[in-house]
C-alpha cells in the first residue's frame, strides 16, 4: 500500500483562480483517475466530485492545481514521499494509512460493495458463503486491512485468495470476462458502474468507511483545508455537490 509505483507521470495544470506562473500558489496533486464519480477521465479531461470540492478550496485561496495521475499505490506513495502535497480519488481514512499520512476531516460517508454480474445471480445472505468465490480489487485499497483484520480471523476469507489489479478498470474487465466472481468496489464507484454495466450488489458493508483528502505527515495545507471545510464551505453546499455527482 505504501510502495511507490507510479503508473503515469503526466502532469496537468488545472487553473483555479490564479496564474500558473506563481509557483508559491501551486499545489501538487496525486490522483487515480479511475474512481468515478470521485475522480475519473471524461472526454480527455480529469473530472469528479473530489476535484470539484478541492477546486472550491483553491478558488477561495487563489491557487493552482498541478495534477499527476498514478495507479492507486503510486498515488498514496507520492503523498508519503512528499512528491505530492495532497491526494484525492475517493481515499478511505484508515488507521493503517494514518500511520503514514495525514487526512482532512471526512467529507463524505461511503459503503463497500461486493459486486457481481447480473447473470451470475450471486446473493450473499451470510458472509460464511464468501470463501467459495474469488474477489478482486485494486492494489493498495483499504479492503486488504478489512479482510486481514476482520474477515480472516473469523475464517470468512483469506487475503491470499484475493486477486489484485492496477485499477478498477482491470477489475471490472476481469469480472465481465468471467475470470472473477466478485469485485470489491467503493459504493460511489459501484453506483456509477451499475448504470453502464450488467452488475449488481451481492453484499454491502455499511457504517465504517469515510473519504478524506490525504496529505504528507505534518502538512500545514491539511490544517487550512480543514478550516475551509469546517468554516467556509456550507454543509448544504457540500451535500449538494455530493448529490450532483452521485445522481
Language model segments and positions:
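Ligand-binding clefts/hinges and TM-proximal coupling segments of bilobed small-molecule sensing domains
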Residues: 20, 64-67, 142-163, 197-203, ...
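A ligand-binding cleft/hinge motif common to bilobed small-molecule-binding domains
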Residues: 77, 89-100, 148-149, 173-207
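Short helices/loops that flank or line small-molecule/ion binding pockets
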Residues: 60, 68-69, 73-86, 100-102, ...
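C-terminal motif of bacterial Sec signal peptides marking the signal peptidase cleavage site
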Residues: 14-17
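Sec-dependent signal peptide recognition
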Residues: 2-9
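Extracytoplasmic small-molecule ligand-binding "clamshell" domains
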Residues: 22-91, 164, 244
Amino acid at each position: 500500500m505504501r510502495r511507490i509505483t507510479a503508473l503515469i507521470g503526466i502532469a496537468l495544470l488545472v487553473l483555479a483562480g490564479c496564474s500558473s506562473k506563481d509557483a508559491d500558489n501551486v499545489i501538487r496533486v496525486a490522483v487515480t483517475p479511475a474512481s468515478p464519480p470521485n475522480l475519473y477521465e471524461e472526454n480527455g479531461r480529469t473530472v469528479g466530485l473530489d476535484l470539484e470540492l478541492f477546486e472550491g478550496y483553491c478558488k477561495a485561496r487563489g491557487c493552482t492545481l498541478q495534477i499527476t495521475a498514478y495507479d492507486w499505490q503510486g498515488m498514496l506513495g507520492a503523498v508519503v514521499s512528499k512528491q505530492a502535497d495532497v491526494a484525492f480519488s475517493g481515499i478511505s481514512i484508515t488507521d493503517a494509512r494514518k500511520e503514514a499520512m495525514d487526512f482532512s476531516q471526512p467529507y463524505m460517508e461511503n459503503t463497500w460493495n461486493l459486486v457481481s454480474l447480473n447473470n451470475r445471480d450471486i446473493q450473499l445472505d451470510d458472509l460464511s458463503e464468501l470463501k467459495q468465490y474469488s474477489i478482486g480489487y485494486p492494489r493498495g485499497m483499504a479492503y486488504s486491512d478489512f479482510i486481514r483484520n476482520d474477515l480472516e480471523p473469523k475464517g470468512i476469507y483469506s487475503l491470499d485468495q484475493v486477486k489484485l489489479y492496477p485499477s478498477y478498470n482491470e477489475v471490472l474487465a476481469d469480472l465481465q470476462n468471467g475470470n472473477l466472481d466478485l469485485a470489491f468496489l467503493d459504493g460511489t464507484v459501484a453506483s456509477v458502474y451499475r448504470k453502464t454495466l450488467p452488475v449488481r450488489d451481492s453484499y454491502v458493508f455499511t457504517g465504517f468507511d469515510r473519504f478524506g483528502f490525504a496529505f504528507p505527515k505534518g502538512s500545514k495545507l491539511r490544517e487550512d483545508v480543514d478550516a475551509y471545510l469546517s468554516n467556509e464551505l456550507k454543509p448544504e453546499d457540500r451535500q449538494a455537490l455530493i448529490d450532483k455527482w452521485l445522481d
